[in-house]
């Protein structure tokens, strides 16, 4: 990447699923830092240390799987439902607002127009410190989706065919 970085047409790069150690290694061997790191981030896997590191390094934290792919009953979780009811919102909106208030960029996937509109309607309410702490208490510190530090998992992802 270093030779490409000196090109007149240089652009910002982004990375995905880079842990702090992998990013530090990247910094040591390249001239340009990524502008964004997309990592799994949701109420059950909050990536608190990564968020601090990314902020210190001037790299934007982007959430991948902000709704934990529906794992662990996220849309029925009592803490999230209580907050949603208090604000007259959906659990999805509460999660998106929580990420936004933490400075985490999120681009939620949806194919339904109504859901897209709902996902955008998060900027006219604010979660209290108490609500933010309540959501912080849901962190398990690990992914309910997959372990990207597990060698067989990484090999499987690397050999997964996306298109014919």
Model-derived features: where do they sit?
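Single conserved hydrophobic/aromatic residue that forms the stacking wall/gate
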Residues: 1-5, 9
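Distinct, well-ordered alpha-helical segments
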Residues: 6, 17-32, 47-55
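Glycine-enriched alpha-helix->loop->beta-strand junction motifs that scaffold or abut catalytic
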Residues: 10, 27-36, 53-62, 104
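Catalytic beta/alpha-barrel core
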Residues: 10-19, 35-45
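Conserved, mostly hydrophobic/aromatic
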Residues: 13, 37, 54, 64, ...
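His/Asp/Glu-enriched short active-site or ligand-binding loop at hydrolase and phosphoryl-transfer sites
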Residues: 36-43, 58-72
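Terminal-tail/helix-coil boundary detector
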Residues: 56, 118-164
